[in-house]
Amino acid sequence: MQFQELVEKSQAIEVTYHVTPEVYYGFQRISNDYNPLHTDEAFAKSKGFPERVMYGNILNGFVSHFVGMALPSRDVMIQTQDIQFRKPVYLNDTILLKAEIETVSDAVEIINYKLKFYRVAETKNVLVASGHVQIGILK
């Protein structure tokens, strides 16, 4: 896919993710992070949370999926990314990732996306994180 075609086809993309037990335990295994905020319900409650807080970097995994699988080209790679965590994410949350092109550099074929992560709720979706990802085109 040519760069301009990718830009045209990926102006705004939404992808829904689920923080399932498989996602949670899979991340725990690969990160080897057993901090009690993420693993101990009583500890999390003692710190003011209603339950264990999911690993924030699970959202980075969702960004990886967005770039590698949700964009309409496989000829892309992440160059930089950042996420600011605003609210906790919990087990079994449904997360809506909204990505919009923020800037495009035609000369070096780079696209910068603005990212917003929402916890899907019955009444109103809640912004849980935001950030950016810069992608480059593989030649």
Give the positions of each predicted feature.
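HotDog/MaoC-like acyl-thioester-processing domains
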Residues: M1-A12, V89-K139
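Hot-dog-fold acyl-thioester-processing enzymes
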Residues: M1-V76
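Generic structural detector for well-ordered beta-strands
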Residues: T16-H18, Q84, Q134-G136
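Short, intrinsically disordered/low-complexity patches at protein termini
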Residues: L37-H38, F49, F62, M77-I78, ...
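Sparse recognition of residues in long alpha-helices and their boundaries
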Residues: F43, Q79, V108-E109
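Mid-chain, well-packed structural core segment of small domains
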Residues: M69-L97
